[in-house]
Curated annotation (Swiss-Prot):
Belongs to the UPF0246 family. Pfam families: H2O2_YaaD. It comes from Lactiplantibacillus plantarum (strain ATCC BAA-793 / NCIMB 8826 / WCFS1) (Lactobacillus plantarum). This is UPF0246 protein lp_0089. PANTHER family: PEROXIDE STRESS RESISTANCE PROTEIN YAAA, PEROXIDE STRESS RESPONSE PROTEIN YAAA. The lineage of its organism: Bacteria, Bacillati, Bacillota, Bacilli, Lactobacillales.
Length: 248
């Protein structure tokens, strides 16, 4: 069983909690992307990032001096968005840390796919960014099926806790009869079931923590996710879609 999650835009450098233990497997491709990004002018980079000057300028300055081999932070600690704060990996037990290194994978526009203890540096590049590289018109074409091949060398269930933007790098390449279970955290709004992005990110982080703490290796056991605000809805769920309803 493999679990996939999305990265976060907000990143930090943290070399104190845990050391980086492994190297990203597609570092050569990351170097290729870095070279392409460093050729962009400031206006081109700002357009690619869809952000204000306040965010674009420091990111552009950082881009010019990125070194992929120095000041590395384990990926699981480098991202500091809502999902990662609610996961709280810095307080995981050793068995929980071992679990995520074996089972959890972070999908990334810049690094492709990451194990939690792969050493990385801060970057800004979303998977849906319109960056052409060589013959590839965008990052989906650039990465192709490589993320899937690294995720599951042998067909096994995939637990999708990633956003659609990132899950699209895996779903088209599933082996015949291989299951990918989408985890849906939804709320009733005006009588309709909808997903609130912030609440979903919080719940995804909490679920990763739950899976790691309980060493979950059976897909059906995911339904027992213990959360004060969410309850598994068997009626609205299917074999490949587990729905959890917000209770407030």
């Amino acid at each position: 069983m493999k679990i996939i999650i999305a990265p976060a835009k907000k990143m930090i450098i943290d070399q104190d909690a845990f050391p980086a233990l492994t190297e990203p497997i597609y570092l050569d491709q990351t170097q290729q992307l870095l070279a392409q990004l460093q050729h962009l002018t400031y206006p081109e980079a700002k357009t690619l990032w869809h952000c204000s000057d306040k965010l674009a300028q420091p990111n552009y300055d950082w881009l010019q001096k990125i070194d992929l081999t120095r000041n590395l932070t384990p990926a699981i600690l480098s991202y500091s968005g809502i999902q990662y704060r609610y996961m709280a990996p810095d307080v995981f037990t050793q068995p929980a840390l071992d679990y995520i290194q074996a089972n959890l994978r972070i999908l990334s526009g810049f690094y492709g796919i990451l194990r939690p203890f792969d050493g990385i540096v801060p970057y800004r590049l979303e998977m849906q960014a319109r960056l052409a590289v060589g013959q590839a018109k965008n990052l989906y074409a650039f990465w192709g099926d490589r993320l899937y091949q690294a995720l599951t060398p042998r067909p096994e269930p995939i637990i999708n806790l990633a956003s659609q933007e990132y899950a699209k790098t895996i779903a088209p390449y599933l082996a015949p009869h291989q299951s990918m279970i989408d985890i849906v955290f939804a709320s009733f709004i005006d009588g309709k079931l909808k997903t609130k992005a912030t609440l979903a990110r919080m719940a995804r982080g909490a679920m990763v923590r739950f899976l790691a703490e309980h060493q979950i290796d059976d897909v059906t056991a995911i339904r027992t996710f213990d959360h004060p605000d969410y309850q598994f809805d068997e009626k609205r769920s299917t074999a490949n879609r587990f729905v959890f309803i917000y209770q407030h």
